[in-house]
Each structure stands twice: as C-alpha cells, then as structure tokens.
Amino acid sequence: METATLIAIFISCSLVSFTGYALYTAFGQPSKELRDPFEEHED
C-alpha cells in the first residue's frame, strides 16, 4: 500500500477511537464520577 493510504487509515482509526473513548467517558461507567458545577452552585 502507499504511504498516504496508510497514514489516512491511521488517522481515521485514531479519530474513531478517540470519539468512542469520549462517548464512553461522557455516558458510560466513568460518567458517574464526573461532577456537575451547576448543581454545586444552586442559588
């Protein structure tokens, strides 16, 4: 394969992996540990 194709595949896989990890952190098990600053400062 050409170098440009390999680089494009690598970048695409990296972006998909990062997006999946971000969604897992936001909505998966670790989301229970996230704090909500709006609930901490009720007026």
Swiss-Prot record:
Q: Could you mention a single GO BP entry for this protein?
A: photosynthesis
A Pfam family this protein belongs to?
Answer: PsbN
Superkingdom of the organism of origin:
Eukaryota
Q: Does the keyword Membrane apply?
A: yes
Membrane topology per record: Single-pass membrane protein
- Where does this protein have coiled-coil stretches? none
Q: Which UniProt keywords apply?
A: Chloroplast, Membrane, Plastid, Thylakoid, Transmembrane, Transmembrane helix
Chain segments annotated as transmembrane: 5-27
Q: Where does this chain mainly localize? A: plastid
The family database entries (InterPro entries) matched by this protein are listed as:
PSII_PsbN
Where's it found, cell-wise? Plastid, Chloroplast thylakoid membrane
The family note in this entry says:
Belongs to the PsbN family.
| Name listed for the protein in its UniProt record | Protein PsbN
